[in-house]
Each structure stands twice: as structure tokens, then as C-alpha cells.
Amino acid sequence: MLGVVAACAFGINAHAASGTIQAGGVAPNFTLLSQEDKPVGLTDYKGKWVILYCYPKDQTNGCTLEAHGFQRDIAKYDALNAIVLGVSVDKVEDHKTWCSKDTFSFKLLADPDHKMVDAYGVPLVTYKEMKFANRQTFVISPNGKVVRVCTKVDEDIPGTVQRC
């Protein structure tokens, strides 16, 4: 993603269920509901690059800046045959509320049961007894392999896709 994005400030109590998926590994399939309350799975995008980014919380400053950065660069992703999917542990209703205020042409997926974030080994951060997905981005090739894992906001994800 291009641009500087502020990180969400949460308490430092993170854990990952099974260790983060590494570059070179197969991306686990998942099916989650989008902000439109429709199921979306990784296999829906076979043959395309997938930029799967996990973020802590809808409508927070850092997460909004990050989402706007992906939206700003959406034409670059389209030109690279790549789609963007955002995932948080928020509920579909939270995504609907956010999308009623901000316009995103990509899907926001709800993972309130932590199934996808656990499968990918995304650490969960606990803050005031609530859990949030840690910020991570997975660049997945058209054949379903993870080619890059970004554990911080990466300003050159389009460049990563282009180089691969």
C-alpha cells in the first residue's frame, strides 16, 4: 500500500493460534461474509492475485487510513489482476456501518469467530477484554501460494505483485 499509515494503539498482549503462514506456503481457503452479507471465499479469486489484509477495527483512525490507501491505489491493483480483501474480527453489521460512511470498492470480510485469522496465524491483540486482529497483509499468487507476508504496513504492495 502506498502512503504512511498510523498504527492502531492497542495493549501489547498478542498471541497467534498456530504461527503465521510463511511466504512459499499454500494460502488456506476460507469463506467469510462481506459487508453485503454475502459469502466470499479465497477460491472465488483463483487465477487472480489476492491482497488479503487484516486490520484491527472498523472506523478507527489507523484502519481508516489503511483502507483509504488501498482504495486510492485500487486502479493499480486492477491493472495487475489483483483484488483487495480486508479482514477484521468485526461483525458484518460493523462493516455495513463503516461502508455507509466510507466508500470502498473492495470487500471487507467479517471474521468474528477468528477462523481465518487463526488459519493464517494472525496474532490477536487483547485490549480492554476485547480481541482484535493484528495488522498483517498476505500477498497471494494466482495459484494460491503466499508470496509475501507483511507484518507492518507496506507501502509497495503493488510493486511486490508487479515484481512477481
Stretches found by the model and what they are:
Residues 41-64:
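Short active-site neighborhood of thiol/selenol oxidoreductases, capturing the structured segment around
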Residues 64-104, 114-116:
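Structural microenvironment flanking redox-active thiols in thiol-disulfide oxidoreductases
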Residues 1-11:
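Bacterial N-terminal signal peptides
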Residues 14-43:
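N-terminal "domain-start" segment that seeds a small globular fold
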Residues 105-107, 123-127, 131-138:
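Structural micro-motif
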